[in-house]
Amino acid sequence: MRSHYCGDVNKSHVGQEVTLVGWVNRSRDLGGVVFLDLRDREGLVQVVYDPDLPEVFNVASTLRAEFCVQVKGVVRARPDSQVNAQMKTGEIEVLGKELTIINSSEPLPLSLDNYQNNSEEQRLKYRYLDLRRPEMAQRLMFRAKVTSAVRRFLDSNGFLDIETPILTKATPEGARDYLVPSRTYKGQFFALPQSPQLFKQLLMMSGFDRYYQIVKCFRDEDLRADRQPEFTQIDIETSFMTSEQVMAKTEEMMRGLFLEMLNVDLGEFPRMTYNEAMRRFGSDKPDLRNPLELVDVADLLKNVEFAVFSGPANDEEGRVAALRIPGGASLSRKQIDDYTKFVGIYGAKGLAWMKLNDLTQGLEGIQSPVLKFLNEGIVNEIISRTGAQTGDIILFGADNAIVVAESMGALRLKAGEDFNLLEGQWRPLWVVDFPMFEKINGSFHAVHHPFTAPRGVTPQELEANPANRVSDAYDMVLNGCELGGGSVRIHNQEMQSAVFRILGITDEEAKEKFGFLLEALRYGTPPHAGLAFGLDRIIMLMTGASSIRDVMAFPKTTTAACPLTNAPGFANPQQLAELGISVVKAAKTED
């Protein structure tokens, strides 16, 4: 039905007859000539109909926005005065000779031109219309090109695209599973995979030493701007490769991807340990475009007569950190109060501050409600450590070390945005040497997942002192977002059993949930390592979208619902009976 895409017609086609199909973006009658902007996924082209062909002209006069039409005509150059430099096809137009209305359109329930006026609910309910917007179409086309480039790279490096099951077994991987009831085995359930983790490890044990898959994953978790109940991973696993080799290969892939798609050279990725990232930036995925850093000052404050500082300073699990904001002395008291409320979201009890109005006047040039508790030597050392100057403000977080990291790390990001301090467009890095475990409410939990290998210890040494062990894990971070995370996997049954015991998984529970894995580890398992990238997040960053919902064709809302199809929905009683399921209705509460 077409000879060219609308957005592909250019000056090289002048004089040629073309057949185009698409949607009417805009139609206007100017002085007896109908101008039609025809749109398809590749862009817009202007079509002109004049009264010399009355039958066609009359049809053109009836066109309205979003009619689906076929156009036949001859390409001609626009006069210089009418060239539109803002359009890809702005040097030409098509003189229409024939016109077929394939389908008319009713008035749209949402605006495609002023989409900002559409609610998120509207955009998702009428997603098939929202996707007609050039911005949305370009993002999905960009996504397709990225996945094609990823496949090319991995194929050319000997990786095999192998599918793994979608109906599988529930395993504890950190989030709730989506469960699928079995009709054949009443009362039993499949789970949709949170990742192909165990199957890709089993593929390594099967001898397929380089695997990849662009795969759907499912997690029933509380949603945020960068989370969806179903999302896509670039999943990679290798045998007989060290963590350094996996990092080098996947960094090569990511650098090549940015160069091909955006003409951006990311350069060599720096390395940073987890401890350094948390100490300097309060985050294990630091945004290095932001020059602000947290500075430890607890050692200076152990003996001050101000319990807010001295308490955490003398607590092994406490921390006092200073954050210098250049030019921050201009902050009003209300703005400081707003920052105090902001850190309160992360559990901080308050925010101390020190304005450096004029350092030439010594302490007289400093304004702070805590200044009376600090001698001149302490103040000068804080100023020296933070590199603060006249006109700056120093903000202090004092609390449990975790609270300080989370609250001051978040404040660092907010202040960087508020004061326009971000430097450069792309700042990648690797974060390495993660703790093997973290303690939550007295119990150990895996920082990555239970199949991550510790670095340089025996199973006995790991169980004897799990709190201080480092994992052979690595995260790729870009502009404060985790692009992907991976690790060397445990390939020894004794080590895997030790990790399960540390996590409070009994031998019986391990056998019930992971018996197939423990069995497989007995039969010559090779050393293996891998990594999984969040494809949606990568596309979001590369296109500048504000949410992964804007780079997915049919995403869910933040409450994990689909307004387009009204999913999830109720099952009919017959289906439930076949599955052996009865629904317990919530009791009504009286007003």
Swiss-Prot record:
GO terms for biological process: aspartyl-tRNA aminoacylation. L-aspartate binds at E173, R219, H448, R489. Its main location: cytoplasm. Residues 197-200 are annotated as: Aspartate. GO terms for cellular component: cytoplasm. Gene3D superfamilies: Bira Bifunctional Protein, Domain 2, GAD-like domain, Nucleic acid-binding proteins. Its EC number is 6.1.1.12. It is found in: Cytoplasm. It catalyses: tRNA(Asp) + L-aspartate + ATP = L-aspartyl-tRNA(Asp) + AMP + diphosphate. InterPro entries: Aa-tRNA-synt_II, aa-tRNA-synth_II, aa-tRNA-synth_II/BPL/LPL, Asp-tRNA-ligase_1, Asp-tRNA-ligase_1_N, Asp/Asn-tRNA-synth_IIb, AspRS_core, GAD-like_sf. Keywords: Aminoacyl-tRNA synthetase, ATP-binding, Cytoplasm, Ligase, Nucleotide-binding, Protein biosynthesis. ATP binds at R219, D220, E221, Q228, E482, G534, L535, D536, R537. GO terms for molecular function: aspartate-tRNA ligase activity; ATP binding; nucleic acid binding. Catalyzes the attachment of L-aspartate to tRNA(Asp) in a two-step reaction: L-aspartate is first activated by ATP to form Asp-AMP and then transferred to the acceptor end of tRNA(Asp). Homodimer. Belongs to the class-II aminoacyl-tRNA synthetase family. Type 1 subfamily. This is Aspartate--tRNA ligase. The gene is aspS.
